[in-house]
C-alpha cells in the first residue's frame, strides 16, 4: 500500500501542544504588536488550524512585510536546489512570535551608546569592540608553611 503525502502528514509530534500547555490561547498572544520589518520565528500552534503554516516552515525565521487585523505576512528564504527563493507566507498571529536573535545585539548597542556618552563626558577614548576571553593572570604559590607533597596512586587489590 502506498504512503500518503498529505499537507499535514508526519506532523504527529511537530504540531502537538507542549506538556500541560493545552487549552485556550492566552490573550497576550493577540496583544503583541507586529510591525513591518520585525524578525519573527514561526512556531505553529496545533490548536488553531486557521492560518497555520506548512510543516516545512516550522522553526524558520523571517521578516514581517505585511500586517492585517488577524494575520501577518512573513518573508522566508527557502532553499530550492542550489538557490534561495523568497516565499511570502500569510500566517495568523498564533503561529508566530518575536525572534530573540537580535536581542543581544540591541542590548549591546544600548550599552555601547551609554559607554560612548560616558567616555565623551570624561574626554577619554573607549574600547567598544568585544574581546575574546583572555588567559588568566599569572600566580605565585608560596611554599612557606606549604611543603609540596608527592602523590602516588594506591595499588588496586581485590579481596574475595
Curated annotation (Swiss-Prot):
Function: Component of the ribosome, a large ribonucleoprotein complex responsible for the synthesis of proteins in the cell. The small ribosomal subunit (SSU) binds messenger RNAs (mRNAs) and translates the encoded message by selecting cognate aminoacyl-transfer RNA (tRNA) molecules. The large subunit (LSU) contains the ribosomal catalytic site termed the peptidyl transferase center (PTC), which catalyzes the formation of peptide bonds, thereby polymerizing the amino acids delivered by tRNAs into a polypeptide chain.
Subcellular location: Cytoplasm
Misc remark: There are 2 genes for eL21 in yeast.
Gene Ontology molecular-function annotations: structural constituent of ribosome
Gene for this chain: RPL21A
Organism of provenance: Saccharomyces cerevisiae (strain ATCC 204508 / S288c)
Covalent crosslink: Glycyl lysine isopeptide (Lys-Gly) (interchain with G-Cter in ubiquitin): 32
Family designation: Belongs to the eukaryotic ribosomal protein eL21 family.
The keyword Cytoplasm is assigned to this record: yes
Family annotation (Pfam families): Ribosomal_L21e (PF01157)
Gene Ontology process terms (BP): cytoplasmic translation
UniProt name for this protein: Large ribosomal subunit protein eL21A
Keyword Ubl conjugation: yes
Example of a GO cellular component annotation carried by this entry: cytosolic large ribosomal subunit
Entry-linked InterPro entries: Ribosomal_eL21, Ribosomal_eL21_CS, Ribosomal_eL21_sf, Translation_prot_SH3-like_sf
Subunit relationships: Component of the large ribosomal subunit (LSU). Mature yeast ribosomes consist of a small (40S) and a large (60S) subunit. The 40S small subunit contains 1 molecule of ribosomal RNA (18S rRNA) and 33 different proteins (encoded by 57 genes). The large 60S subunit contains 3 rRNA molecules (25S, 5.8S and 5S rRNA) and 46 different proteins (encoded by 81 genes).
First-listed, main subcellular location of the protein, grouped into a coarse class: cytoplasm
Keyword tags: Cytoplasm, Isopeptide bond, Ribonucleoprotein, Ribosomal protein, Ubl conjugation
Disulfide bonds: none
Amino acid at each position: 500500500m502506498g504512503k500518503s503525502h498529505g499537507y499535514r502528514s508526519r506532523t504527529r509530534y511537530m504540531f502537538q501542544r507542549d506538556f500541560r500547555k493545552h487549552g485556550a490561547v492566552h490573550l497576550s498572544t493577540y496583544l503583541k504588536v507586529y510591525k513591518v520589518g520585525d524578525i519573527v520565528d514561526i512556531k505553529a500552534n496545533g490548536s488553531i488550524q486557521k492560518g497555520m503554516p506548512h510543516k516545512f516552515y516550522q522553526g524558520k525565521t523571517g521578516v514581517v512585510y505585511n500586517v492585517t487585523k488577524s494575520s501577518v505576512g512573513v518573508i522566508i528564504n527557502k532553499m530550492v536546489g542550489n538557490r534561495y527563493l523568497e516565499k511570502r507566507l500569510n500566517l495568523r498571529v498564533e503561529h508566530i512570535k518575536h525572534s530573540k536573535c537580535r536581542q543581544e545585539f540591541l542590548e549591546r548597542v544600548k550599552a555601547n551608546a551609554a559607554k560612548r556618552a560616558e567616555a565623551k563626558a570624561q574626554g577619554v577614548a573607549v574600547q567598544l569592540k568585544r574581546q575574546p576571553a583572555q588567559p588568566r593572570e599569572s600566580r605565585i604559590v608560596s611554599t612557606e608553611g606549604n611543603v609540596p607533597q608527592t602523590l602516588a596512586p594506591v595499588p588496586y587489590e581485590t579481596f574475595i
